[in-house]
């Protein structure tokens, strides 16, 4: 099923300056490491800059200009250069190791913040955003930030030093020649900025498309059972091939843009060398510069061009890093629509009184109200069942209690407290949920049960499993409670997964229970055992059950029938049958079977 991508890179693009400012706080955390890295960069730059001066001195001395060339001078200059190379080696080691590690730390910090923000986003975001896209943003996109964080300050710092120093030294040799050479730089900058923009756009498109491709792969691999059951391998192959082709086309366009960028740079390189050959050669002919100065001049120009070329080569890495920061910023800019109010206080465990006061709800992307002016009192310890046709709002009503979604209007109170004014953590700690679609995490049976109570003892975990009727089958597994359940519990049957999910709630032991037909996947024997355990657990606790089999709720304190008009009927099983209304018709359709 297609999903819309919230805050997709195609929606809005921040400028480079804004993105850099967004990134600076992460870089500032490691400013000591950064400054030392830049100091090492300055040392390596010094070593590069000294060589042309040494060669100029030797050449001029050999030509009889200035000092006389002797073996002692050569040895002293060689010794100086040797010492500089030792310093350069030590500085380069720091830059290559500690500098990169700084980048890794920054990437880790950004990924932590992105994941923390994702945990705060509500169901609407995940309903409308593909998991593959999210995965790409917090993994692949941030990989490039490591290189960006290290090389961006370093490369531009080195380039600035080399360009300024080269300009000063070249001007001392020949101002007109230097101005002629540097006249090429502004034009080169204008062309580079233009082509860089095209390059960045291509990289942004690649990131979007790789997210789409990841989502396609994820759907196909996770749905392998369905794919094989319907012999739909060809359809899945075609879906993948389509996404793969689109990614290939976008990447091809990116390389065209990169080729244009690199070619323009080489053309400007050649133009600068041409200026040196013409102007420098003529200066030699007319005696305006010495041969040594010409050698030094050529070496400094070579250094300058190498610096510019390095910046050009870094442009791809720079754009990848900027794209990663941009997509990171888009996650962080996604608003948290459901969070703690400034005056939020913890919800203390209470009797479990729940009150709906004129509650209406509509999904953000659909203006049709699912619930309209619902008012409802659920007494502490009451067992309430919700029945009705699909789309009637049963699940939505239950999802509003733990604030998976925010009410459009009205309010919900638990023990007299508006749930919007209590902390989310405390609210959800007081509610136990067994969903129809069970999700088990990759790990052991014990770890999945302990999810209901972090830090639970082994004895508590085993007792929860016993109450859920899961102990017998768990002990029969190869490693018992330490058995690895596989990704999403793939190694367990549906009934086994359901019982582990129920065990979580037993361990959590909350005052309010929400059950989405918690026993529907169990065999008859287990259903009886778990049903008895649920009865015991529900005693004295407020319990809401979304019922699909009417036979399971005959003894409930109250049954609500929900329809498009809201709550259409309310009463006990016998009272509703006596009314001979909607519930009566549902009961007589398929008595004892799945009716809804």
Model features per residue range: what roles?
Residues 10, 19, 27, 95, ...:
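Juxtamembrane loop-to-helix connectors within ABC transporter transmembrane domains
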Residues 31-32, 123-124, 140-149, 153, ...:
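An intracellular "coupling" helix at the cytosolic face of ABC transporter transmembrane type-1 domains
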Residues 34-94, 171-176, 287-291:
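Transmembrane helix-loop-helix hairpins at lipid-water interfaces of multipass membrane proteins
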Residues 39, 47, 51, 91, ...:
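Hydrophobic alpha-helical transmembrane segments of ABC transporter permease domains
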Residues 39-40, 84-103, 154-161, 180-206, ...:
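Alpha-helical transmembrane segments of multi-pass membrane proteins
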Residues 63-66, 70-76, 169-183, 253-326, ...:
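Helix-loop-helix
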Residues 114, 118, 227, 328, ...:
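Helix-loop junctions and hydrophobic alpha-helical segments within the transmembrane domains
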Residues 347-596:
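ABC-type nucleotide-binding domain
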